[in-house]
Swiss-Prot record:
Domain of life: Bacteria
Binding positions (Zn(2+) 1): 72, 105, 167
InterPro entries: ArgE/DapE_CS (IPR001261), Bact_exopeptidase_dim_dom (IPR036264), DapE_proteobac (IPR005941), Peptidase_M20 (IPR002933), Peptidase_M20_dimer (IPR011650), Peptidase_M20A (IPR050072)
EC number: 3.5.1.18
GN (gene name): dapE
Cofactor(s) this protein requires: Zn(2+); Co(2+)
Function text: Catalyzes the hydrolysis of N-succinyl-L,L-diaminopimelic acid (SDAP), forming succinate and LL-2,6-diaminopimelate (DAP), an intermediate involved in the bacterial biosynthesis of lysine and meso-diaminopimelic acid, an essential component of bacterial cell walls.
Pfam families registered for this protein in UniProt: M20_dimer (PF07687), Peptidase_M20 (PF01546)
Protein name, entry field: Succinyl-diaminopimelate desuccinylase
A Gene Ontology biological process term: diaminopimelate biosynthetic process
Amino acid sequence: MVIDPVTLSQELISFPSITPTDNGAISFLSDILSQYGFTCHILDFGDDTVTVRNLYAYRGTEEGPNLCFAGHTDVVKTGDLTKWKFDPFSGHIEDDILYGRGAVDMKSAICAFIAAVSRINFNEVPGSISFLISGDEEGDHFQYGTPSVLKWLNENNHKIDYCIIGEPTSKSFLGDTIKVGRRGSVHFKIICNGIQGHVAYPHFAENPIDNMVSILYKICNTTFDTGNEYFQPSNCEIVSVDTGNTSRNVIPDTIVAHINIRYNNIHTAESLFDIINNICAQVTPKYQLLHSVSGEPFFNQPNQYSDMLSSAIKKVTGQDAIASTSGGVSDSRFIKNVCPVIEFGLKNETAHKIDEHVPVKEIYQLADIYTEFIKQFFNLSTT
């Protein structure tokens, strides 16, 4: 029986799987895929504070390539419920538009690929199709999601040959953008120290704010690069500055700033650390610099599979897709270490927003695109 991707999307949205809580979403998908002949492994990873539920499901033969669809069932918080037109977990359809948290990012894409798979005659598939579904991509415990599943796959001799991720990559219309790489993301914490004192007697104090302002000014006026053929220029944003000082007549002794740099493959996190460190040292010796990396940049050269996806998009929508590396980080930063990866999904305009929504027509189109891609990948009949 062929699955209706919109009905399935409504059902999946009804699970309030706010990261890292699963609330039954993974088991629901496991039950659906089991009915279609998939061997399903529900995988729980975590620590004393949290457990993240994930799913790996596969069907087919080990003789040929394994085409994997990767996604996540966790969603971000809803925000003020009174501002939503409809219950964000009702999967409500109004005027042929599906509303709900996860409608765009990215439950509908998961359902579209499941619908596509339900149309495939597996007797003709010279390989296997699999699903890698994470229960925490949006939150702080992502290490117990896709990275842990990939480790499990390696330990249990499951090999993925190519992966498509259903992140919402489209911008103005469905099919205008596919992701063939991602920028890196590095976060810096800058601490400047001074001497606390009374604002009326500044000569007895040392205000660390002055040095921090100078440091941030230099950073904001630094051209890290001008980009290249595949990536836009690296950019830096100040995300917070705080002294923790609530007194109006006290010069603080410490100030902390957080900055984030989204960077291309001209840099590494360490080369950017050197740049920021040198700027700080030019201003004052009284500083500390810490950094953490969310993901390094990567780029996949166009290949036969990305050409197949572009062809499938063209056939269904009539549009030519643009290959892009823009946007934030995704689980592709982990999967790219295992196999080539590409990302394609719905329009991202309302992702994470109040009244997140998608036209039902585009869910059907996405299922059609995924179906065509699967057929081309395995050289199946496209009639």
